[in-house]
């Protein structure tokens, strides 16, 4: 999805 926690993981 598009959650803050997900964004960090996808960025890493």
UniProtKB/Swiss-Prot annotation:
Keywords assigned: Allergen, Pathogenesis-related protein, Plant defense
GO biological process: defense response
The organism's place on the tree of life at top rank: Eukaryota
Family that this chain belongs to: Belongs to the BetVI family.
UniProt-recorded name of the protein: Pathogenesis-related protein
Organism: Foeniculum vulgare
